[in-house]
Swiss-Prot record:
This is Membrane antigen containing repeating peptides. Sequence repeats lie at residues 1-10, 11-20, 21-30, 31-40, 41-50, 51-53. Residues 1-53 are annotated as: 6 X 10 AA tandem repeats. The lineage of its organism: Eukaryota, Discoba, Euglenozoa, Kinetoplastea, Metakinetoplastina. Residues 1-53 are annotated as: Disordered. Keywords: Membrane, Repeat. It comes from the Eukaryota. GO terms for cellular component: membrane. It comes from Leishmania major.
Amino acid sequence: EAEEAARLQAEAEEAARQQAEAEEAARLQAEAEEAARLQAEAEEAARLQAEAE
């Protein structure tokens, strides 16, 4: 019984670790999308600047 409880505890900890990794991956994905958006805005600003000159 104690061994089963310990095994279930270890499985729960592994599941929590995987959940945390998935949340970190989602956060990094969102940061990458924001960086891409800012890059596109910078390129658009540079294009408008070139047109204005």
